[in-house]
Amino acid sequence: MEAACLVRSLGLPQGEEALKARLRRPGHPRLREALAAYLKRLQAPEEAFRALERLEVGAVVTGQQAGLLGGPALTFYKAHTALCLADRAGAAGVFWVASQDHDVEEVRHLHLLRDEVPETLSLDLPPLPSGRIPLAPHRERLRAFLGPWAKDYRLGYALEAETLSEFFARVLLAFLGERGLVPFDPMAEELAPLFLEALERELSDPLGSAEAINREAERIRALGGKPPLRRKPGATNLFLETDQRRLLFYEGGAFTDGVRRYTAKELWEIARADPSRLTPAAGLRPVFQDLVLPTAGFVVGPNELRYVAELSGVYARYGLAMPALFLRAFGVVVEPPVRRILEKYRLDPWAFVDEGEAAFLRAAEAWLAPFRAFRDRVEGLLQEASRLVEEAEALEPNLVRPLRRFRARVGGEAERLRRKLLAAQAARDEVLARHLGRLKVHLLPFGLPQERVYPYAMYALRHGEALRRLAEAPWEGRVALYLG
């Protein structure tokens, strides 16, 4: 079942009317103070500080793992949707930096397209949350890979970060801070203490949220859906970080991370000493987010929408109204060389993103049709000459020899025409192959949609108008951004 259909079937809140109905919900009483301190440490632009005032109205929240250079372009499309919705509601646009995530494979690669060649930097990162990974050991490799772009003042500012997650947050501020985007890093020293009350409550009933998820999963299955979240017996929705981040299980009145056992009191003492060590799993993270932030709207991708759809029971358990859910905008950047190719074949960029080579060959068919038509007409002339010889044999034998000479001359000329036609078509086929290759590199790198590979910061560094074009783009649906 499609994620959007599932959300409708479950009757979950969607749309701007639902967003407006959820405004003016209070966040954590120390939220503004903590965020102001966090933004001050990051030397955020004034627009981000001013956005804190709009938290009194509410927040439209989105989030993503802390990828290099802001991660793939979909990060900026999420932020764009959140900012547009927030502006329309008079609320703040907040970006949750998923610094607690320890899946480093998702964030250790940076892909850039330069001189028509995709280049990749892969960092060797420890299996830790990105909020724990220092940037210093990787700073020079990043600078070298970025080349002249590393001298851009925005990247100079971002590369001053202490950790990988801070680098990500600084990139967001450098490129989107002037639009008032407010990053929120739950592992930041200023912000992590805001989750203590939520942690205390979860520790008091450690299986309650997991059971709520499993009940909702059964409901979704009954509707024909495939719920992505399911908690194993005894699994909680909390991770504990020691030498690495491990899921906690609860049985017989005690917790275990598979290495040692803990009482609830011991875990609470760990959390009080350093609240960033006890963090929520995917099934609890949005609820923890909304216990601290005055979330009225939540912008997600299609896969996230599926797992958020399972959380209505967890929201109810915490006495929270689920925020209005919105799918992010989907974007594709079209630079001048690609635009010329697309226009030549009258090919829509999204058709190529969806179907790749098949869409291109369909569009190229019209370009090759004249060659085929001309070849068919030459073949027709040869066949007509042969028919004339056959008719002459029955009509007047004296015409046979001259008509055979005529057919031979026509055949010789036709063969020369055929060779020239093949050479011309081969040249055109070479052009087709070159054009197809260029489209793949730009729009479907590594066989994936562009928005999942190249960072939007790359386009902003290459094209001065890239951020303005994004700001002017629709906040929902599919968007083609023509640059250059």
Curated annotation (Swiss-Prot):
One GO MF term: ligase activity
UniProt keyword terms in alphabetical order: Coiled coil, Ligase
Coiled coil in keyword set: yes
Domain of life (superkingdom): Bacteria
Coiled coil: 372-435
EC category: ligase
InterPro entries: Bacillithiol_biosynth_BshC, CC_BshC, Rossmann-like_BshC
EC identifiers of the protein: 6.-.-.-
Disulphide linkage map: none
Family designation: Belongs to the BshC family.
NCBIfam families associated with the record: thiol_BshC
Protein name, per record: Putative cysteine ligase BshC
Originating organism: Thermus thermophilus (strain ATCC 27634 / DSM 579 / HB8)
